[in-house]
């Protein structure tokens, strides 16, 4: 009888010891929003991609975005408000724009403003890559090429040497995050060309926030 009690007590002790670990090992759901939005379906290069958050409760941030002290300049902290009329958005708004675009709304274009070496590490599904250098004459962009982008990609048109933006798309731009100047450079260039500020949206958090929230990324 004493042996049985001792054995039973040992089993209880073992169960109590492993219980916290078992509870920790059991992942709880990781939705996108409070209220149950768990996934979003978007198109990327003709394929349907499911955007969701990493479901591993123990997952850590990507090492690519773990640095805190990149040299400034050039990696300086960007303001919340980039320019009058340009709306700063967050992750939920970005996902909404991606869903609208993927559903066939061609008045929206989500743009990854980073250079190809950054994009190769991963990008937001549904975005198209337009490196900030493509709109920057100081970096070698020529007026003819810029004009082709404005008309062919953005839906603007030129009349008597002036740009018209009545049918221009809403551009949603991002880069690496709040310490990155690539999408701000694109936005400032567009504003200089006369692009309407209300048709430009800026995801300030960029890839840093997107990655740190465990949201889906794709590689070219």
PLM feature segments, named:
Residues 115-119, 134-137, 177-181, 206-210:
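Solvent-exposed loop/turn segments at secondary-structure junctions
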Residues 77-169, 220:
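Positively charged, proline/Ser/Thr-rich regional signature most characteristic
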Residues 121-122, 182-187, 212-213:
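A short acidic (Asp/Glu
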Residues 1-11:
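Bacterial N-terminal signal peptides that target proteins for export
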Residues 23-121:
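Flexible, polar/low-complexity N-terminal or interdomain linker segments that lie immediately upstream
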Residues 9-19:
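Bacterial N-terminal signal peptides
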Residues 148-207:
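Catalytic cysteine-centered active loop of the rhodanese-like fold, especially the PTP/DSP P-loop
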Residues 213-220:
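Active-site neighborhoods of enzymes that stabilize oxyanions during catalysis
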